Amino acid sequence: MEYSTRTDTLERLSTDCLIVGVFQKRKLAPTAEALDALFDGLLARLLKRDDVEGKAGDTLLVNHVPGGRIDRVLLVGLGKREELNVAAYRKSLAAAFKVLKESGAKHAVSALHEVEVGQRGADWKIRQAIELLESGLYRFQEMKGASAEDHPPRLSRLQFLLASDQDAAPVETGIREGQAIAHGMTLARNLGNLPGNVCTPAYLAEQALKLGKEYKKLKVSVLEESDMEELGMGALLSVARGSRQPAKLIVLEYRGAAGKAKPYVLIGKGLTFDAGGISLKPAANMDEMKYDMCGGAGVIGAIQAVAEMGLPLNVVGLVPASENLPDGNANKPGDIVRSMAGITIEILNTDAEGRLILCDALTYAKRFDPVAVIDVATLTGACIVALGRHPSGLMGNDDALCEQLTRAGETTWDRVWRMPIWDDYQEQLKSNFADVANIGGPDGGSITAACFLSRFAKDFKWAHLDIAGTAWKTGADKGATGRPVPLLVQYLIDRAA
């Protein structure tokens, strides 16, 4: 998709489709009102005839409009003007782009960003439009044969209508950021949607290495199992023992800041398939465990977005990648392993493996002397039980960091909800035979998982994002979502400001 600004009068505007807004009770937004006057009240008459009230998400596609320069006009309901909030605006955009995609238009011009959405600026409104349009256009066809290929949408260009060139700067910022975030989300979705027999730890490492060749400021390296053994990463290596696929620790280092500025470290769980190990998962929906690497995919996608934007800060991405399968050499319940930090771990459940690969990555992160560390993982089904599939779970040891992530989530609508990690919960992780157990019983499962990780994050500011409920959709719309790329990138944009 191509995005740009367009400064033109309605009389001279030429496009396959012009997208304009209408508020509830058929009150036209400014561009729609001007267009209606140009068409002698046609739009108002059609809204009334078709009983379109202008509720958020209403749409009316008008073909064969007068003048011959504009082929179609898409009227989009925005709801009550005084109640237009983020949720309503996003609903309206999604509805508009669904109709636009199916309209056959190759080129469209949008004026929806002219409406006020709280205190949001033009750059934010443009970003939302691009992210939602790219999400709506996304199609994962890589694993289908040629005979199964359907007809792709014809839409190839979207322009944002401006009253004056003086309005261009924030819109162009929104385009630049929106495209970078959308590209990062697409990369994360593509990696997540690949099957486990294709997207192995080695494949994930190869994709990261390719990314490193695309951007001058990005250096990518991969630690092999022999390197991990030298470092004492016994927890990470133990998870890989049940698989024929060797583990990898992918290191992405983006240097956008001058001098020796400390980096922000993002860690993403990269379990390319999780059968549960000896503590085998139920067969139903086990295919979705290919998504257990979406934390790693999200970190790789976020790093790509940062590199594309050229943000003036340093960012390190760490992706511990492995499979978790049952085998004669796999972890057994009751086994004890020694982590890189020297902490011994009793493995009471081999299906609580994500925290085992993350804890060694957290210890490894210390060598970068980070400003802050954020780990991202599809860690616990308990988080879905607690929060559903709308927000990601947020836990951490630094209030300011957690507040910054919360604000970034509100900005992007990639929201989080903070949960406690009080010392009280640490009691559940006691082991009679090791320093810590890898599970804490059925109560507060997402919290005790974070409490486990917190033991390896005492030397820096740290936050944990449990994306088990947000990284992919199940059911008829099954597929990776690309979250939390928008959240992570917004957090870094805010730090670079």
UniProtKB/Swiss-Prot annotation:
GO biological process, one term: proteolysis
CDD domains reported in the protein's UniProt record: Peptidase_M17
Gene3D superfamilies assigned to the protein according to its UniProt record, in alphabetical order: Leucine Aminopeptidase, subunit E, domain 1, Zn peptidases
Residues annotated as the enzyme's active site: K281, R355
Signal sequence bounds: none
Entries under Pfam families matching the protein: Peptidase_M17 (PF00883), Peptidase_M17_N (PF02789)
GO molecular function: manganese ion binding; metalloaminopeptidase activity
Record's catalysed reaction(s): Release of an N-terminal amino acid, Xaa-|-Yaa-, in which Xaa is preferably Leu, but may be other amino acids including Pro although not Arg or Lys, and Yaa may be Pro. Amino acid amides and methyl esters are also readily hydrolyzed, but rates on arylamides are exceedingly low; Release of an N-terminal amino acid, preferentially leucine, but not glutamic or aspartic acids
Name of the top EC class for this enzyme: hydrolase
Named cofactor requirement(s): Mn(2+)
Coiled-coil portions: none
Positions contributing to Mn(2+) 2 binding: K269, D274, D292, E353
Record key words, sorted: Aminopeptidase, Cytoplasm, Hydrolase, Manganese, Metal-binding, Protease
Binding note for cofactor: Binds 2 manganese ions per subunit.
Keyword Hydrolase carried by entry: yes
Stated role: Presumably involved in the processing and regular turnover of intracellular proteins. Catalyzes the removal of unsubstituted N-terminal amino acids from various peptides.
Protein name as annotated: Probable cytosol aminopeptidase
Source lineage: Bacteria, Pseudomonadati, Pseudomonadota, Gammaproteobacteria, Methylococcales
Gene: pepA
